[in-house]
Amino acid sequence: MSMVYANIFLAFIMSLMGLLMYRSHLMSSLLCLEGMMLSLFVMMTVTILNNHFTLASMTPIILLVFAACEAALGLSLLVMVSNTYGTDYVQNLNLLPC
């Protein structure tokens, strides 16, 4: 494993650990999820470029589309929770009416 792959994998693990440790606030959870998606995007792009696998060159762009959708939904949920309850605690998500 080259140093580039190790650093990208370390960034993913650090984002995952941040998600597991700092999950009390919704904003910190969303930031950690974005870090995970960014490291996955970079890993996929570097792998495709190193292997000259041009058939899968659309895959990182599709991942970015899903990351943008995830960010938009997460921010809309954050705005709804903070307007309703005044805080961005994840425990307030259990109180939302369906």
Swiss-Prot record:
Enzyme class: translocase
Entry's Gene Ontology BP terms: ATP synthesis coupled electron transport
Source organism (scientific name): Erignathus barbatus
Family the UniProt entry places it in: Belongs to the complex I subunit 4L family.
Record's subunit section: Core subunit of respiratory chain NADH dehydrogenase (Complex I) which is composed of 45 different subunits.
InterPro entries, sorted: NADH_UbQ_OxRdtase_chain4L/K, NUOK/Mnh_C1-like
Reaction catalyzed: a ubiquinone + NADH + 5 H(+)(in) = a ubiquinol + NAD(+) + 4 H(+)(out)
Protein name: NADH-ubiquinone oxidoreductase chain 4L
Main subcellular location: mitochondrion
